[in-house]
């Protein structure tokens, strides 16, 4: 299972989080769930078109009623911002035209790009496009990631490697990459290299270490909760279980004198029979 499924989706809610944060329950056109999903796809396509040199690792989207917040995680924030913020203003204008809402654009710098799987995959793909030998590109990327502190890395390339007539897949691995361990913090990235022989897919898995119980507790504490639950003891009738139990005991106590009453009345009758 861990060998096939996407590592991000497999660990969703454990070590990874959603990249889109919004809720849709409307039936109006343009505000339905499928409309928001389609809009998110277009936003990410807009970020990837013409921004290859910026090194965008991830795009996070958060929606409110009248605003859309877009967080761009990039290794080269200067390219995204542009001179005097001209490029950022252009991107914000296109996003507002696409969504029809006010857009808050945040550009965040990636501190360690050698540890970001998406950026590593993009770097290998760019080297393949430049006709660098695929084995050399893969080994160079693995060495850089290990020097940056990765505990394990795996890179796979699929396609017409080296211009061969028949396509094949090759991968290299250094260190540990436990894909089936849910507590393992594994980053995954995919990118396609467009070469003269066709497209070559590049997949990268980077193992950054296990998530400790302390970090899991911190994530659980920061997660939104459903709020305080209502007191189960409170009943609509105004009485809890203890009161109901005591209320049920009262008829039994009241029934005891009623049961003794016929015996008291029968005593004089028996006495009259003895006199007769």
UniProtKB/Swiss-Prot annotation:
GO terms for biological process: translation. One of its GO terms (molecular function) is rRNA binding. CDD domains: KH-II_30S_S3. Residues 218-227, 253-276 have a biased composition (Low complexity). Residues 228-243 have a biased composition (Basic and acidic residues). The keyword NAD does not apply. The keyword Transit peptide does not apply. Residues 43-111 form the KH type-2 domain. InterPro entries: KH_dom, KH_dom-like_a/b, KH_dom_type_2, KH_sf_prok-type, Ribosomal_S3_C_sf, Ribosomal_uS3_bac-typ, Ribosomal_uS3_C, Ribosomal_uS3_CS. GO terms for cellular component: cytosolic small ribosomal subunit. Residues 218-276 are annotated as: Disordered. Keywords: Ribonucleoprotein, Ribosomal protein, RNA-binding, rRNA-binding. It holds the Pfam family KH_2. Belongs to the universal ribosomal protein uS3 family. Binds the lower part of the 30S subunit head. Binds mRNA in the 70S ribosome, positioning it for translation. Part of the 30S ribosomal subunit. Forms a tight complex with proteins S10 and S14. This is Small ribosomal subunit protein uS3. It comes from Pseudarthrobacter chlorophenolicus (strain ATCC 700700 / DSM 12829 / CIP 107037 / JCM 12360 / KCTC 9906 / NCIMB 13794 / A6).
